[in-house]
Amino acid sequence: MSEFQLVTRFQPAGDQPEAIRLMVEGIEAGLAHQTLLGVTGSGKTFSIANVIAQVQRPTLVLAPNKTLAAQLYGEFKAFFPNNAVEYFVSYYDYYQPEAYVPSSDTFIEKDASINDHIEQMRLSATKALLERKDAIIVTTVSCIYGLGSPETYLKMVLHVDRGDKLDQRALLRRLADLQYTRNDMDFARATFRVRGDVIDIYPAESDLEAIRIELFDDEVESISAFDPLTGEVIRKLPRFTFYPKSHYVTPRETLLDAIEGIKVELQERLEYLRSNNKLVEAQRLEQRTRFDLEMILELGYCNGIENYSRYLSGRPAGAAPPTLYDYLPADALLVIDESHVSVPQVGAMYKGDRSRKETLVEYGFRLPSALDNRPMRFDEWEGVSPQTIFVSATPGNYEAEHAGRVVEQVVRPTGLVDPQVEVRPALTQVDDLLSEITKRVAVEERVLVTTLTKRMAEDLTDYLADHGVRVRYLHSDIDTVERVEIIRDLRLGTFDVLVGINLLREGLDMPEVSLVAILDADKEGFLRSERSLIQTIGRAARNLNGRAILYADRITGSMERAIGETERRRDKQIAFNLANGITPKGVVKDVADIMEGATVPGSRSKKRKGMAKAAEENARYENELRSPSEITKRIRQLEEKMYQLARDLEFEAAAQMRDEITKLRERLLTV
């Protein structure tokens, strides 16, 4: 059996050894809940990695959003390169659920765009849980939404062993049952191609390997894994298991039983609607449902098949839907990162989904059984959650009520102490901020500024830009990937100041930031609560010269508690450093770390090495350019290459070219 192998050059330090020991003790003692109260930059992820390596249990890591999930995925992947670290988040790039607005008689059709790469990673995650004990799944709140039941899913898997008697046509039929399609021209995920007695199959959950089955006289002579791009055989295999293309694939007999159940419910619902003189709703429901039934009968699925999940999973009315938690082994561990945000998210999902579906049922767009296609309720989630570790710098009320043990991790391994907190008058906050920014920019450090409203953030950004500050504004309309790019550019020094409202808090890892400025800190409310203030102050805790300035005309209760807690932690950290002769060291972290491994579909290490080599050669060549005409000519050449790469969908390489062009244009101004 595979074991978790933690690969790192670091040893636990500061508060980490004691925190790891206490958490492992708590898990082995059977504590249902523990809280790791760890300050920003104290290495909470490293401590959790050590706990996983010691207890040797499959682990589900729940993050509050995709950005943090991607960051955690990259970190765990680096800690456990020889184990199954997987990424399970919503596979929708865009999702518009079906809805009905009775006031305007408007029906909105379901519309969605599925990210193929994330769908592959989700399938890979469930496969890892079913096949291996050494699995770490990094997920978001999407893990509480309905998924095909593991029992049905496992009934559909196809095992092929070398030496098996296997009729070729029977094999192709089984692959079709798994919703794989034959495509001899375009060999992609969840497709297969046939060349005589050789069948190439690209598994739905695989990113870089396809499987070749060679038959001789209806016997499996050879099974091998090969690179679908080059055709190079990677290794020979004694056996292989093929999983369905979707978690919702269902055996034929279950589908036939489900169709009968749906017909019975449809008849009952039609009688109810007609008896209440809702003839339009009855006609609409009958037409839509019979169309779905016909599709299921012919193709094995239909658009919106998840609305019939009660029948497909065989669960009684009102029962909790099958979710990712059903795939977890009994001895699994649950780690909830930034639990003060993640736990309330779990509770919020059910009610919004319910009210939308009740309208659809009432007006004849769906059968009442569609209400069972839903996320888990909070009490159901509590019932299926395994042993749990809450991780947060500012635990919420739920954690306080359920914490069997609170483990503090206040002292950082680097010796860094919490930032100094100053309170300054709000009357002159903008001018004072401008002078502080000038000081930080002079020593190549970065600044975060948090305001109360969008309007205020926009006005401040314009004002700073007018005074020659390189500034950007981060707001809720910016999508996840662009947000990550903005944070990356801040760290790289493309600009110096980032202004935001509520997006500069949990988990963002920016060691270059030495100043956090909180405007109007005395305006009590959600954005200036004790928890929000501590989290925002913590953004400067990874820098040796970290400082937080709160602009306020009075000290509120939240400010007093936040400053008091920061001072308590700071005093403890300084005392530990003095007692152990530790000199604080700044954090140095590779900028490429932010979303490594979770955003680039089908990325191959060879391709990345080639791109890095090309970038080095470009840099050498560009340093030799002297005259403005040479630089201008080079810019034109690179622009042509960049547009060609974009046309070839090589966006990562095109982005590198764009960065090179920007540098050359800056040089052109100084030549």
From Swiss-Prot:
Per UniProt, residues of the Helicase C-terminal domain are 429-582
Motif stretch (Beta-hairpin): 91-114
Ranges for the Helicase ATP-binding domain?
A: 25-412
Q: What is known of its domains?
A: The beta-hairpin motif is involved in DNA binding.
Gene Ontology biological process terms in this record: nucleotide-excision repair; SOS response
Q: Where do the UVR domain residues begin and end? A: 632-667
Q: Where is the composition biased (Basic and acidic residues)?
A: 614-623
Its taxonomic placement starts with: Bacteria, Pseudomonadati, Pseudomonadota, Gammaproteobacteria, Pseudomonadales
What is its subcellular localisation? Cytoplasm
Recorded hits in NCBIfam families, A to Z, give: PRK05298.1, uvrb
What InterPro entries does the record point to? Helicase/UvrB_N, Helicase_ATP-bd, Helicase_C-like, P-loop_NTPase, UVR_dom, UVR_dom_sf, UvrB, UvrB_inter
| Family, similarity comment | Belongs to the UvrB family.
Record keywords: Transmembrane helix included? no
Q: Which PANTHER family match?
A: UVRABC SYSTEM PROTEIN B (PTHR24029:SF0)
Cite the residue spans of the region called Disordered: 601-623
Tell me the protein's name.
UvrABC system protein B
Q: Which UniProt keywords apply?
A: ATP-binding, Cytoplasm, DNA damage, DNA excision, DNA repair, Excision nuclease, Nucleotide-binding, SOS response
